[in-house]
């Protein structure tokens, strides 16, 4: 069942990829039903808060009529960052399943483990579900981004002599 819902999260990650966003997708499931979906929209929304998990949690809370998601499992293609791990704790989500680890910002196992700290909620974690697919999508995105950035025109450096008299 975990692979089935991780595949749904990967569909959302691919949508983010196509829109020029870091390809992370998330679904929240209660029983056998998806109650929340989210994908990264930081560029589109011009917001540091527009992460896949935050979007999915907000939708699940609206759909279920409350902020406690006690009977839910969160599936996300990339290990949650500190902000998203905090949102998971606050929403009381009992189980988190993620695909790829995040060695730069992962707050579940890679960099730190917020779920093991002295908070009032400690989700169960399953990792590595469809990890290769999730990691490949992220690698392709960042490889394309590096090429794009390398080919962008650079700003011309202003020489100090050119700046004189412009006060």
Model-derived segments and spans:
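Short secondary-structure boundary/capping segments
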Residues: 26, 65-66, 115-117
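Helix-adjacent hinge/juxtasegments
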Residues: 49, 54, 58-91, 95
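Zinc-dependent deaminase
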Residues: 1-19, 83-167
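Short beta-strand scaffold segments in enzyme catalytic cores
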Residues: 24-32
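A short acidic/small-residue loop/turn micro-motif
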Residues: 41-44
